[in-house]
Amino acid sequence: MMRNAQYKMGDGSILNYYEIGTAKDKLLLLHAQGTNSLSFNHVIAKLSKCYHVYLVDYYGHGGSSNNPEKYNLISIGNDMIHFIENVICDSVTVLGHSSGGLIAAYVAAYSDKCTKLILEDPPFFSSWGERRYNTYNYKDLSTACHNFLSQSKEKDFVHYYFVNQYCWNFFPEESRERIREKLGGFALKYREKHPNKNLKVLFWPKKFLEGFNGLQHYDPRFGEAFYNDSFNDGVNYCELLSRIKCKTLFMKAKTTIGENGLLQGALSDEDLQRVKSLIETMEIERFDCGHGIHVERPKQFVQAVVSM
């Protein structure tokens, strides 16, 4: 049975976390931006048979503190190291999905408690500096967060993001606004009736609603940190990655380069090879699916983790 608890940092910040399993080996899971630890529900039961699993909501997500001063890699990374040292109190395999992978890499670079590292499709180099402008995340979630914070009419970010997400650009132009208005109305009604539940929208594919799970507890100011690049906080990723000496697995999802060179995915194959050249101990496993590998390919995902 999964236990939910909170850990209070010395500065009063709260890290909400879940714990399950009694195995000797410890596993720390760090979720993607916009969701929370429960996004791993597809795989947690099987992982907990092999690991004592900890799942932490990092700041701006889930039940953890909303503190914009901590929405950067260094602050979150250092607090995750503190969590490992004071809650897990043991060596640990650290797995991070997407932006959680950036945090996991920081932990592996600066803590000898991290003995194995699993990177689930993190956006190394692509979300850094001017490169970020031509990525799907920047056009989508980051820009939606920035625009939401720049207005005062719309109060509910979940509904705002649904009707302003970048994927509407892939709908036929002649029917786009009609469909957006109709489905946006469904989304608004659901949000008004169920403000604390994961979003459900009639006719919207369940696969794509996964990205909205936990969004009702997301602080859009975290997305602003990716919009203005303050999340990276001047971190030199070449230096950071070269510090990682533990056994490392990189899970690579499919990447598509769209019109005008838009990176529709976390990172390019060139970025991946750059990461590989910096982490000497890294192996790569490719998955024929989108960015959420643990959601789209749960059996293959679990097998890869357990094989570590």
PLM-predicted stretches and their roles:
Residues 13, 19-63:
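Conserved HGGG/HGGXW glycine-rich cap/lid loop of the alpha/beta-hydrolase fold
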Residues 58-95, 99, 106, 130-131, ...:
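Active-site loop/oxyanion-hole signature of alpha/beta-hydrolase fold enzymes
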Residues 101-112, 117:
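Short glycine-enriched nucleophile-adjacent loop
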Residues 118-175:
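Flexible "cap/lid" loop of the alpha/beta hydrolase fold
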Residues 174-239, 255:
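Hydrophobic, aromatic-rich cap/lid helix
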Residues 242-288:
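Conserved loop-alpha-helix segment in the C-terminal half of the alpha/beta-hydrolase fold
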Residues 286-298:
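Catalytic histidine-centered segment of alpha/beta-hydrolase-like enzymes
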Residues 295-307:
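Post-His helix in hydrolase/transferase enzymes
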